[in-house]
From Swiss-Prot:
One of its GO terms (cellular component) is cytoplasm. InterPro entries: DD_LRRD1, DEATH-like_dom_sf, Death_dom, Leu-rich_rpt, Leu-rich_rpt_typical-subtyp, LRR_dom_sf, LRR_domain-containing, LRR_R13L4/SHOC2-like. One of its GO terms (biological process) is signal transduction. It comes from Macaca fascicularis (Crab-eating macaque). The gene is LRRD1. PANTHER family: LEUCINE-RICH REPEAT AND DEATH DOMAIN-CONTAINING PROTEIN 1, PTHR48051. This is Leucine-rich repeat and death domain-containing protein 1. Keywords: Leucine-rich repeat, Repeat. PROSITE patterns: DEATH_DOMAIN, LRR. The keyword Repeat applies. The keyword Repeat applies. Residues 767-855 form the Death domain. LRR repeats lie at residues 143-166, 167-189, 190-213, 214-236, 238-259, 260-282, 284-305, 306-328, 329-351, 353-374, 375-397, 398-420, 422-443, 445-466, 468-489, 490-513, 515-535, 536-558, 560-581, 582-604, 606-627, 630-653, 654-676, 678-699, 700-722, 724-745, 856-863. SUPFAM superfamilies: L domain-like. The lineage of its organism: Eukaryota, Metazoa, Chordata, Craniata, Vertebrata. Residues 88-100 have a biased composition (Low complexity).
Length: 863
């Protein structure tokens, strides 16, 4: 095989591996790619009718291993890479497919580089292992050469010795285990390794023996606790890729300069402050990640890496660029977001191959007209700077596809912006734009347009010429009339015009049959327009914060509607017309004036989420209990009439996962709440609840419990049964057991441990009280006490009464009473209080004095 072919194969592995690391690192992919991909995927999901409802998992999903041959694994990776070059699969709608095809083709050129920042599961291929060991490790063998072993998240605490003794193992993935050292790994067993990945293991160092791995091409020890790289790493002459992302490295490992074949180096998210001048010895380095370190200057050494194509310096403290940056002749991607740049050195505009330049969140006030040199530029991110204008010369960047200028001080765009014929994404949110220029209409390939947070009063009718546009956001401007030009956009599926002054909807919107997502909240709408009802493909409609009072019967035509938001309107009665929406999943009628719910709501067979918070219900609307599909219910009343009780029928909603009954005047939780087996979240704060029913403690999937601001004085000891609980809050309760300071940390273990010890203590105190009563009670008071404790004579009479002392009989009677009371789930503390009340009623004051003394003594002892 030629050297060129070998390099190509290694670079292919490089791309695949860098994907794996970068996804686990949560490295952001370029905004244009990510957002546009999400946008198109969302459209695809809409068209395919996919649900986006949240899925709750109480227990982590089990990870299984698959086995294929090495060549099969490589074929699989190649196939997946090809898939990743596409933004989405062909849509079921011809129109959408046509509008997206050009987008896909244009971006394919640099999508391979972007794919460095997206993770793929590495092919899991198993080595030759005995059938017994295969069964034990969950491995299978399908070939006899070039094996990959993937033991990710298997709970391993040391290297799997049996696997290492197999000479054919070449690729070993041990990510997400607890392997903290190389102890137990015989370096001789590792000699054949070409890829070793130990991400997320808690490693604090690398052993010097790593120098023996002469065949190693890829080493990934990202997401560990490594602070030092041993000098022996310089002996890895064949290494192509090194990943040390998210560790504690403070000094750049100078020994890396000996790794002449290194192509990818990731040292992002460490504590580096300096880069050595010897770095240029890495003459084959193509990708360098130094994001989120502590670099205060742009290291000049970086400028002399002749083959560098991607450089990430995001999240440092760099305030200027050196003139030597012009030497990076092959650089295609430069990421400098979140730094301290106040200007750009003019030499940066000599990087003629640059395709992606990200400069968001700096302090740039001006962009040089020399930007015209960037003839290959595809992506330009300039959000969150101090720019007041963009030079006209930007229109010489003929290949530009993504331009984002949000959060600056722009008042207008370049007059000849229409020359950017390839522009697909233009975002100018939160600036000082007064109008959208007519020249926008000549951007024939534009797909995503955002001008939210400006002072725009109208949209030019010529926008109708942008027939490939699929998403528009115009939120929080000064628009008074619905832009008619938008109604002529055949590919528009997402439109958001929240926070404007629109009071009427034109009939022309009826022609926007392709529209899937429409937001018009915080406008001046007085009615639910009949024209909305012609949008038969619409899935999401937000008309919240308007002044709508009723719903037209023709809403039944909106057969695709999944989400309907009508919060903060003027509804006084529940609109029965909504009950014809058989496909509705989410309905928000919060902050209206509803007093009751129609029984027709049972027709919403697919409803999953309801928000009726802050209304005027006289009673809990029991009609809701018919909804078998409901997963989330919010009936909190921070602004509405307070509910005082919950019906037992609440338990009929067996699919319920989230319940919010906060800010009411509810006195008790239904005793059968334990029948809501799927409940994950219960918010009942700011009520008058004084007791937690035992059945609540059987909710095994419960993860969130908020009972703050109630009247709880004690927590049940069995609260530890809620083993899935992750978030708890008992603040602002008059708690005595446990005391409030124990609950402030919101740690279930601390609370449960206290209650366990308190139970043990209360049991001992109760037994001592039994002895005090038995040793001091009179025959007459004993009979009265039995009556007060509801103990029948048959339970206290003994066959040998003449020979059994009063003390023994009294103690036996109290034990019987305790046994009976335990059936009612009464705690030892509650039994003690009940017994004291009974003794007070029969006038056993001498005994009471002794018990009081005992209580005072025990309270003085801290436990």
């Amino acid at each position: 095989m030629s050297e060129k072919e070998g390099m190509s194969e290694e670079l292919e592995d490089t791309i695949s591996q860098f994907r794996k690391e970068s996804r686990s690192q949560s490295v952001k992919e370029p905004g244009f790619i990510k957002e546009t991909s999400n946008l198109i995927n969302e459209a695809s999901d809409y068209l395919e009718g996919k649900s986006s409802n949240q899925i709750y998992e109480t227990h982590p999903r089990q990870i299984t291993l698959e086995s294929t041959s090495s060549s099969g694994s490589k074929s699989k990776r190649n196939e997946e890479q090809k898939k990743n070059l596409q933004f989405s699969e062909t849509s079921t709608r011809t129109e959408t497919s046509q509008s997206l095809s050009s987008l896909t083709g244009r971006i394919a050129e640099y999508q391979a580089l972007v794919n460095f920042l997206s993770h793929e599961t590495v092919g899991e291929v198993s080595p030759q292992v005995s059938e017994e060991n295969q069964k034990h490790l969950g491995l299978e063998t399908t070939c006899k050469d070039n094996f990959t072993v993937n033991l990710e998240a298997k709970g391993l605490q040391e290297f799997p010795k049996d696997i290492l003794k197999i000479k054919y193992v070449k690729h070993l993935y041990l990510d997400k285990n607890q392997i903290k050292t190389f102890q137990g790994a015989d370096s001789g067993d590792l000699l054949g390794l070409e890829i070793l990945s130990l991400q997320e293991n808690g490693l604090s160092s690398l052993p010097s023996e790593i120098q023996l791995l002469h065949n190693l091409r890829i080493l990934n020890v990202s997401h560990n606790h490594i602070s030092h790289i041993p000098k022996e790493i310089s002996q890895l002459g064949n290494i192509r890729q090194l990943f040390f992302y998210n560790n504690y490295i403070e000094n750049f490992p100078s020994d890396l300069e000996c790794l002449g074949n290194l192509e990818i180096l990731s040292l992002g998210k460490n504590k580096l402050r300096h880069i050595p001048d010897t770095l240029p010895s890495l003459k084959y380095l193509r990708v360098l990640n130094l994001e989120y370190n502590q670099l205060t200057i742009f290291p000049k050494a970086l400028c002399f890496l002749p083959k560098l194509i991607s450089l990430d310096l995001t999240g440092n403290l760099i305030s200027s660029l050196p003139k030597e940056i012009r030497e990076l002749k092959n650089l295609e991607t430069l990421l400098l977001d979140h730094n301290k740049l106040t200007f750009l050195a003019v030499e940066i505009f000599q990087l003629l191959k640059i395709k992606e330049l990200q400069l968001a969140d700096n302090k740039l006030e001006v962009i040089s007209h020399k930007i015209e040199n960037f003839r290959e530029l595809r992506i330009l991110i300039l959000d969150k700077n101090l720019l007041k204008n963009i030079p006209e010369k930007i229109c010489c960047c003929a290949m530009l596809e993504c331009l984002t200028l949000s959060d600056n001080k722009l008042t207008e765009l370049p007059k000849n912006i229409h020359k950017l014929n390839n522009l697909r994404k233009l975002h100018v949110n939160r600036n000082n734009m007064v109008k959208i220029t007519d020249s926008i209409s000549h951007l024939n390939n534009i797909c995503s347009l955002e001008f939210s947070g400006n002072i725009i009063a109208g949209i030019p009718i010529e926008i109708k010429n942008c027939q490939k546009i699929i998403k528009i956001e115009l939120n929080y401007n000064k628009i008074m009339y619905f832009p008619l030009g938008l109604c002529a956009l055949d590919s528009l599926y997402y439109l958001s015009v929240n926070g404007n002054y629109i009071s009427e909807i034109p009939a022309d919107i009826s022609f926007s049959k392709q529209l899937l997502h429409l937001e018009l909240s915080e406008n001046k709408l007085l009615i639910f327009s009949e024209h909305f009802c012609s949008l038969i493909n619409l899935k999401y409609l937000d008309l919240g914060k308007n002044q709508i009072k009723k719903i037209p019967a023709s809403i039944s035509n909106m057969i695709s509607l999944h989400v309907l938001i009508l919060c903060c309107n003027k509804f006084e009665t529940f609109p029965r017309e909504l009950c014809t929406l058989e496909n509705l999943r989410v309905l928000d009628l919060s902050e209206n004036q509803l007093q009751k719910i129609s029984s027709d709501i049972c027709n919403l067979k697919r409803i999953q989420k309801l928000n009726f918070s802050s209304n005027q219900f006289i009673h809990f609307p029991i009609e809701l209990c018919q909804l078998q599909s409901l997963e989330q219910l919010n009936i909190s009343q921070i602004k509405g009439r307070k509910l005082t009780r919950l019906p037992g029928e609440l338990s009929n909603m067996t699919q319920l996962k989230e319940l919010d009954i906060s800010n009411n005047a509810i006195r008790e939780i239904p005793r059968n709440i334990g029948e809501l087996r799927n409940l994950v979240s219960l918010h009942a704060y700011n009520n008058q609840i004084s007791y937690i029913p035992p059945s609540l403690l059987s909710l095994n999937d419960l993860q969130q419990l908020n009972l703050s601001g109630n009247n709880l004085t004690a927590l049940p000891s069995a609260i530890y049964n809620l083993f899935s609980l992750k978030e708890i809050n008992f603040d602002d309760n008059p708690l005595l057991r446990p005391p409030m300071e124990i609950c402030k940390g919101k740690q279930l273990y601390t609370i449960a441990r206290y209650l366990q010890r308190a139970d043990e203590r209360d049991e001992k105190i109760l037994e001592k009280i039994f002895k005090i009563v038995a040793n001091n009670i009179t025959e007459t008071n004993f009979e009265f006490l039995c009556q007060k404790l509801n103990l029948a004579n048959s339970e206290t009479d003994m066959p040998t009464k003449s020979t059994v002392s009063l003390s023994e009989r009294a103690h036996q009677a109290l034990v019987i009473w305790k046994t009976q009371s335990n059936k009612l789930s009464l705690t030892a503390a509650a039994l003690r209080d009940q017994l004291i009340r009974a003794l007070t009623m029969i006038g056993a004051y001498e005994i009471m004095d002794k018990i009081t003394a005992l209580n005072l003594f025990t309270r003085a002892i801290k436990f």
